[in-house]
A protein has these predicted regions:
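A short, well-ordered alpha-helix in the C-terminal region of glycosyltransferases
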Residues: 386, 393, 400-414, 421-424
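Nucleotide-activated donor-binding/catalytic signature segment of Leloir-type glycosyltransferases, i.e.
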Residues: 297-319
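Glycosyltransferase donor-sugar binding loop
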Residues: 282-299
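Conserved acidic donor-binding segment of nucleotide-sugar-dependent glycosyltransferases
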Residues: 372-373, 377-384, 393-398
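Conserved donor-binding/catalytic core segment of Leloir-type glycosyltransferases
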Residues: 242-260, 266-269, 284
Length: 436
């Protein structure tokens, strides 16, 4: 079976969806599928080896100029291809991850319009490549925001199965101003109804998005979230190492952005540090920081300083895989108390794989993650005091921390490897996987 997996580059930032797409593409290959991971917009950036193709369709510079400069469509094709070179795209879009979604309303609608949009020539180029050179049996879309090409693909490759993954489309849509948001939601719903299947990692999140986009919830296909467990096979959790007792260390690993809820954790940490027995509790947080959120980070650091806790918390930047493993190896607890409905929770599975128990809000994909893995506690969402209560319970109970960490790690390492998701995907597409 030949599969083309269309993934969306994130302008040089470490992107959870990109990294998971890369891991899934590798696993699909190991299971016997001829899978091509094809980037759109920009090259993808991962924290391990990438299998993505080197050329890019819908290059970020090209689609922007096609949308904003009508005469650009008359520029010779060979010059446009120069703008799609990976090195140039990486340089030209190095700050694009800081672009506010509310400034992209027209471009979003144009991209979703496919052949009727300003990027029609890019639609034609991609579809011709799929039809004439690749001839795939199935095409996977990393989200429905990139699915404006579906009607053209349906016409030119009627036998190909089209599968989209719902994994964070809402986070982008929520930042679009009205009426762009409503129009985009309507169009995404139309495109979703033309897919053979919609994959979700969480039933709760999937049903919420189906209602929002007007999709039939019965057509959702649940493929539980997985990670590449290879980096964690020889990992020794802190709770199992012979280390002297020290301060309990709480960790956060996600984008530094309001929707990921760092402010909730900072407020909970300040609350927690005023409680008996928490005089030495520390907080380490890390994740990609866009220019538009530097003020947000400064606000959180200022809160810590005003509370007299500046020396007990640290921002560790955006580490690579080795740095992430080193950070997880020093943690006793983990929390990403998102403000939005989290569709995945990759960093949660990574923390559990490292034997670190989690304390999470009961919203989005988190209830299913915690209940299925048994590796943590759920608390009321958007409530820093409730989060502090959950953290305090485990700060004061090291035996429960060890037990939850052990249970969570065992579940992830035995049942949440990306190979299982690849097998389910292949079976859904009608092919027999190599392993069972």
């Amino acid at each position: 079976m030949k599969i083309v997996f269309l993934t969306a580059g994130a302008a040089g930032m470490f992107c959870g969806s990109c990294m998971h797409d890369n891991a899934l593409a590798k696993a699909l290959r190991r299971e016997g599928a001829d899978c091509l991971l094809q980037p759109l917009y920009t090259p993808i950036r991962t924290d391990e080896s990438s299998v993505a193709d080197t050329h890019v369709f819908f290059g970020g510079v090209n689609i922007y100029l096609l949308d904003k400069v009508p005469l650009f469509r008359f520029v010779p094709a060979f010059l446009k291809r120069l703008l799609d070179r990976p090195g140039f795209l990486a340089w030209a879009t190095r700050r694009a991850g800081s672009t506010d979604a509310k400034l992209l309303g027209d471009l979003t609608l144009s991209m979703l319009s496919g052949e009727a949009g300003n990027q029609a020539e890019e639609v034609t180029r991609l579809v011709a490549w799929l039809r004439d050179e690749i001839r795939p049996d199935a095409i996977l879309f990393t989200n429905l925001l990139i699915a404006g090409v579906i009607p053209a693909i349906r016409r030119e490759l009627p036998q190909a199965k089209l599968v989209a993954i719902l994994q964070g489309d809402d986070a982008f849509l929520d930042h679009l101003p009205s009426p762009y948001r409503e129009r985009a939601e309507g169009r995404i719903g139309e495109l979703g109804r033309q897919c053979d299947a919609i994959v979700v990692n969480s039933i709760r999140y999937g049903e919420s998005m189906a209602s929002r986009l007007g999709l039939d919830a019965a057509r959702l296909k649940l493929l539980p979230l997985t990670i590449d467990t290879a980096p964690f096979r020889d990992f020794v959790p802190k709770s199992q190492r012979d280390v002297r007792p020290e301060a309990v260390r709480i960790g956060y690993f996600a984008r530094i952005a309001p929707e990921k809820g760092l402010h909730n954790l900072i407020d909970a940490f300040i609350d927690l540090c005023g409680r008996p027995g928490c005089e030495d509790v520390r907080l380490d947080f890390a994740g990609w920081l866009g220019e538009q959120n530097r003020g947000y980070l400064e606000e959180q650091l200022s809160k810590l300083e005003r509370a007299g806790l500046g020396d007990r918390a640290a921002y560790l930047g955006s580490p690579d895989l080795r740095g992430k493993l080193a950070m997880l190896g020093e943690l006793d607890l983990f929390s990403v108390p998102t403000s939005h409905e989290e569709p995945k929770g990759l960093s949660v599975l990574e923390a559990l794989a490292a034997g670190v128990p989690v304390v999470l809000p009961a919203k989005g994909a988190f209830p299913e993650l915690v209940e299925s893995t048994g590796g943590g506690l759920l608390v009321d969402p958007d409530d820093p005091h409730a989060l502090a209560d959950g953290l305090y319970r485990l700060v004061r109970d090291p035996e429960s921390r060890r037990r939850l960490g052990r249970i969570g790690r065992e579940h992830v390492m035995t049942r949440r490897g990306v190979e299982s998701q690849a097998r389910q995907m292949i079976e859904m597409l009608g092919m027999q996987p190599i392993s069972r």
